[in-house]
Amino acid sequence: MLKLAFVTFLFALASARPQDVDSNRVVALPQDNFEVTDIGFEKIKAEPAPEVVNNDASYAYAVDISVPTTVSQMNCLKTSRYAAVFIRGFTPFGSGAFDTTSVTSIRNAYSAGLGIEVYMTPQPLSSLQGYQQLDALYNGLNGNGITIRSVWIQVTSPANWQKSATTNVNFLNSIISRAKQYGLTVGIYTNQYDWSQITGNWATLSSDVLLWYWHVLGGGVTGETPATFDDFRAFGSFKKASVKQFAQVESVCSLTVNRDVYVVGIPAAASSKNTDFFTQEDISSNNKKIVVGGVIGV
């Protein structure tokens, strides 16, 4: 467990990147407050996010979450002009495991007509190989009637990775290779600092791997950066970005979320308004397969 002391809140939040330091995950906080007792702060209130105003048809808004959700919350996101949701399907806790809460969240998001992408927060210190962790995610979703077409791999919080960049690259290669065996599109969630620290600025990654990068100045509305890609700079093998996380620790529809903007690609089946493919009864009873992923264009 990384211990931080004698630092300001802003530095602490920036050092943690978009994750809490102890669990190496995208920030997805308790409904109202963030406990940060390890660094001497009691609670951080999630501020209400500004209303989405999108005047650029080439961009769309999303949120990323790793907490349980309800149908009403997903419907609220849809009516609040969010087009997609990134849902964690693999948790790093323990040795790493399929995140069972993702099943209900995916069904709820599908019912609401939201586009759905799945990300995994791998556990690089586990005895499980990278491909085994991807298998757990893939089989967990498939066994619950959910077909996955793409996966995003979280590569952040250097303190939670091996010290050897070569070891980390091999671990990631194991995940990526397995994902491609399944025919999945692969994306990486990281930024220039994290990528450099964890992989040694790995520059030979396949060019078909997508990038979701984060850039915030801190938590809440005052820490937001513009919901554009104007601040992107190429690094590693990434010459362009498909998704940007521009806000963290904000409240939307009674959920504490991070907010994202992405380049609009070919709409996925999961984001179609033509929901008569699946009735709510079908979704609840698992009679039909839900297809997720592919919302983000190359």
Curated annotation (Swiss-Prot):
Its main location: cytoplasm. Keywords: Antimicrobial, Cytoplasmic vesicle, Immunity, Innate immunity, Signal. Disruption phenotype: RNAi-mediated knockdown causes a reduction in survival in response to bacterium S.aureus infection. Expressed in intestine, IL2 and IL6 neurons and some neurons in the head ganglia. Residues 1-16 form the signal peptide. GO terms for cellular component: apical part of cell; cytoplasmic vesicle; cytoplasmic vesicle lumen. CDD domains: GH25_Lys1-like. It comes from the Eukaryota. It is found in: Cytoplasmic vesicle lumen. InterPro entries: GH25_Enzymes, Glyco_hydro_25, Glycoside_hydrolase_SF. GO terms for biological process: cell wall macromolecule catabolic process; defense response to Gram-negative bacterium; defense response to Gram-positive bacterium; innate immune response; peptidoglycan catabolic process; signal transduction. GO terms for molecular function: lysozyme activity. Residues 59-277 form the Ch-type lysozyme domain. SUPFAM superfamilies: (Trans)glycosidases. Induction: Induced by Gram-negative bacteria S.marcescens and B.thuringiensis infection. Involved in resistance to Gram-negative bacterium S.marcescens and to bacterium Gram-positive S.aureus infection. This is Lysozyme-like protein 1. It comes from Caenorhabditis elegans. The gene is lys-1.
